[in-house]
A protein has these predicted regions:
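A short beta-loop-alpha structural element at the N-terminal edge
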Residues: 2-17, 28
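Conserved acetyl-CoA-binding loop-helix of GNAT-fold acetyltransferases
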Residues: 122, 128-141
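Active-site rim helix/loop that mediates acceptor-substrate recognition in acyltransferases
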Residues: 34-55
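Conserved GNAT acetyl-CoA-binding A-motif
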Residues: 113-116, 142-155
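Conserved acyl-donor/pantetheine-binding loop and adjacent beta-alpha core of acyl/acetyltransferases
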Residues: 62-120
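Conserved active-site alpha-helix within GNAT-family acetyltransferase domains
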Residues: 133, 145-147, 156-173, 177
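Helix-loop element at the rim of GNAT/NAT acetyltransferase active sites that forms part
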Residues: 16-36
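Conserved beta-strand-loop-alpha-helix junction that forms the acyl-donor binding cleft
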Residues: 118-127, 151-161, 177-179, 188-189
């Protein structure tokens, strides 16, 4: 895995759009938000993670991406405000509210540490080739090194199965609006 640094504005636009398109093609919350709004929201979120310094990719071919951080990572104010301004300016408020929730923070708040993972995605051209496991290697290794869980939320039951195949277990599920279920997944290294 490679930490993404020194992207041009064009790179950010290109890959954030591809990430948004990959999420838009998945079931779950994606089915309840207009396609263009969903793609735009992932463009904004990708830029946020890039500015935050938490965006990683599988290789220089950019097959898959994720953002991860530990429990004590503080979000820099500048990138967070930039993201909020863009969301409010570019996406209808109702669609922002529909897609936002972090169940894992509530469930794992008593843990001394954890590795939080977000935006796990394999671009459409590379799906079905085993890249999901490769995308998760780095945060799993970090969790094992620290002896803490690696956690994430997903609204996609198909991804639950894929995450389980990669070594995660489902630790919670919560019914949300629009018949969506939010699943919390955890990788628990043997030393955690």
């Amino acid at each position: 895995m490679i930490k993404i640094e020194n992207w041009s504005t064009e790179d950010i636009e290109k890959y954030s759009r591809l990430i948004g398109e990959a999420f838009a093609a998945s079931p779950g919350i994606a089915e309840t938000i207009p396609h263009d709004d969903l793609v735009k929201s992932f463009e904004i979120i990708t830029e946020f993670y890039y500015r935050m310094g938490t965006l990683y990719t599988t290789s220089e071919k950019y097959e898959g991406f994720l953002a991860y951080w530990d429990k004590n990572t503080r979000q820099p104010l500048g990138p967070a405000l930039h993201m909020i301004r863009r969301m409010l300016r570019e996406i209808p408020l109702l669609n922002i509210a529909t897609g936002s929730s972090e169940q894992y923070k509530k469930l794992y708040r008593k843990e001394k540490d954890y590795i939080a993972v977000s935006m796990v995605v394999v671009l459409q051209a590379y799906q079905g080739q085993g890249f999901m496991k490769k995308v998760l290697e780095l945060p799993f290794a970090e969790a094992a090194k620290r002896g803490c869980p690696c956690i994430l939320d997903t609204d996609n039951i198909q991804k639950v199965v894929k995450y389980e195949h990669c070594g995660m277990t489902k630790t919670a599920e919560k019914k949300m609006a629009h018949d969506i279920t939010l699943y919390t997944m955890a990788y628990l290294p043997t030393s955690a």
